[in-house]
Amino acid sequence: PSRCIHFHDVCHDCPYLWGGGSSRDLSRKIFRRKEKLYRGRHITFVSCSRWLGTEACRSALCVGQHVTSIPNPIDVAFFKPGDKDEARRRCGFPLDKKLLLFGSVKISDERKGFDYLVEACRILLEKYPDIKEKLAVVVMGKCSQELEDRLPLAVYSIGYVEDETRMVDIYNAVDVFVIPSLEDNLPNTIMEAMACGTPCVGFDTGGIPEMIDHDVDGYVARYKSAQDFAHGIYTLLYDVDHRAFSHEAREKVLSAYAPDVVAGRYIALYRNEIEKCGTCEKSKPS
């Protein structure tokens, strides 16, 4: 996590363990086990984002090893654009409002940044009070009903959604997907939303700026700036060619995260590693 850099040297006192761990906790034991396993071996580590790859390079476990990044794939034949009005009818959403979507498995997790979304919506209405009756937020995930009273806009709380077909409808029904996460790697939700042609607003953190091309298919807000996040929401809703951004979002996913693209990158990586092994074998004295 961003608050912990013990992995730069050796893991211990892990903040994810009960009580914050200890100097000789499970994280340290696993670290030492990996250290022994990796010693003397030439390993290529693959992260799913460049950000995570950079973090991995800072780990004592990866010293002298090769780290590269290849993203996770998404089924672009399943997550795809559809008719917005039909999707809204199936979801029970209004046809006469702009809709934002915020979703997380556990919305109350402070790392998901719900407080920043609340503040961004407040700033938005303070600056543009006339949009209050024309804008609503779809909130998806556990604890969504508990948090809906905090938003200053109309809220459609839909709880945790397991049905992927319904998920596609939800992404197609909304105008903008908002992800105010303070820590994230390569969020599947951004990938899914963009695959459905829904532009996204997110903070400049983790792998998010790798996914969203600022002012091309979405908006990357300054980290922890609710004001810039609010500006991003308004920009995508009212100031840009939504159809063009939607098209670019879909194209980004097709070019970067489609299964054949990701598979091709893994094939190229394996071929490169095999060639290196062959070169090493030939260079050994007989």
For the regions a protein language model found, what residue spans apply to each?
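Carbohydrate-associated surface elements
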Residues: 51, 73
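Conserved donor-binding/catalytic core segment of Leloir-type glycosyltransferases
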Residues: 93-112, 118-122
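Nucleotide-activated donor-binding/catalytic signature segment of Leloir-type glycosyltransferases, i.e.
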Residues: 128-134, 141-165
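Short alpha-helical donor nucleotide-sugar binding micro-motif in glycosyltransferases
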Residues: 169-174
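Aromatic "clamp/platform" in nucleotide-sugar-dependent glycosyltransferases that forms part
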Residues: 182
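Short hydrophobic beta-strand element within catalytic cores of glycosyltransferases
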Residues: 199-202
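Conserved acidic donor-binding segment of nucleotide-sugar-dependent glycosyltransferases
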Residues: 214-215, 219-226, 235-240
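A short, well-ordered alpha-helix in the C-terminal region of glycosyltransferases
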Residues: 228, 241-256, 265-268
